[in-house]
């Protein structure tokens, strides 16, 4: 049954919140366990819908998956199946990350084109091109990515764009290829570094993680391991932006602030007081936020996943902000819902110009994806009256205990069955 959130605006948020493991990391780590026969253990798994969905994908490939709280125990078989069917894959985008491990381990893969968030075109061209350079035949056939290889051999691979997904799929195939693979213009996101750390624990030889050039020396086989997922920087930043919007005071634990330096700098520019430790940060906002300009870019730039929250912040800031989207072209669909809440915003190509108002007005709004949903809830926190946020299953895919955490911070929000 469909559910919605009812958010009553006007409360100042304060307190402490701890974030769990990163959604953008755990799903790739789960897929990587297919590379080694035996049982791998992943800890600090977030309580989000996409984790059991990925578990179903892996079970369909012959793995045994046990989810126990924040622990996932995954036993990969000696001969995994190579066909990830549409029923399991269609529900979320990250399911395509089994492509690289299957090509690496089975030398063949058939993965249905994935579903997921409606934030614009995210083609698999770079994934396919990279796998072809490693020696695989890779094409789209009947709605599936189909790859076959006699052997995989290392190659020099130049990515047109530092795509996270392409970097990860190429990486997970290259770790068991013959010879040396170099990925130029590789994605530098902390989630990619986390994957490299786990692969090296499994016996891979990956150098340069977190830099634009990654070197992978292939090994014959990998072994199972135990690994702890890094903290979710996107969830953590969402709480920091919530503090700034509500003129609140929130301490966020369980995340490395080094993964969020540009975001925290922007919050400082908006007038917040930001303090940091090795594994936490605190955002305190006393006055109305100041307008700031934001341009999304691959890491270490401002994350595209936080663009909706940046627009929500700009909508009540003092002044006019320009938000530029350089990653996903359709992410500005969110602006239409913000206008329903009274925001003074307009889009022009990949720019959104937002003139801040003292307060938004409540209205029914609809989530189109995980981050847009979170942005709408933050907007509801500063709107006059009760805002109804619909299609909140999107939010549940990326934010563990979202309502419970908001309530603990002083928000007035409830989940209602429609």
Swiss-Prot record:
Region forming the signal peptide: none
Pathway recorded for this protein: Cell wall biogenesis; peptidoglycan biosynthesis
GO BP, one annotated term: cell wall organization
Classification via InterPro entries: Enolpyruvate_Tfrase_dom (IPR001986), Enolpyruvate_Tfrase_sf (IPR036968), MurA_subfamily (IPR050068), RNA3'P_cycl/enolpyr_Trfase_a/b (IPR013792), UDP_GlcNAc_COvinyl_MurA (IPR005750)
GO molecular function: UDP-N-acetylglucosamine 1-carboxyvinyltransferase activity
Enzyme type, top EC level: transferase
Active site: 117 (proton donor)
Reactions this protein catalyses: phosphoenolpyruvate + UDP-N-acetyl-alpha-D-glucosamine = UDP-N-acetyl-3-O-(1-carboxyvinyl)-alpha-D-glucosamine + phosphate
Residues that coordinate or bind phosphoenolpyruvate: 23-24
Broad class of where this protein is predominantly found: cytoplasm
EC number: 2.5.1.7
Domain of life assignment: Bacteria
Keyword Mitochondrion among UniProt keywords: no
Keywords, sorted A to Z: Cell cycle, Cell division, Cell shape, Cell wall biogenesis/degradation, Cytoplasm, Isopeptide bond, Peptidoglycan synthesis, Transferase, Ubl conjugation
Covalent crosslink: Isoglutamyl lysine isopeptide (Lys-Gln) (interchain with Q-Cter in protein Pup): 81
Location of this chain's protein in the cell: Cytoplasm
GO cellular component: cytoplasm
Residues annotated to bind UDP-N-acetyl-alpha-D-glucosamine: 93, 305, 327
Function: Cell wall formation. Adds enolpyruvyl to UDP-N-acetylglucosamine.
NCBIfam families in the record: murA, PRK09369.1
Family under the similarity heading: Belongs to the EPSP synthase family. MurA subfamily.
Full protein name: UDP-N-acetylglucosamine 1-carboxyvinyltransferase
Lineage: Bacteria, Bacillati, Actinomycetota, Actinomycetes, Mycobacteriales
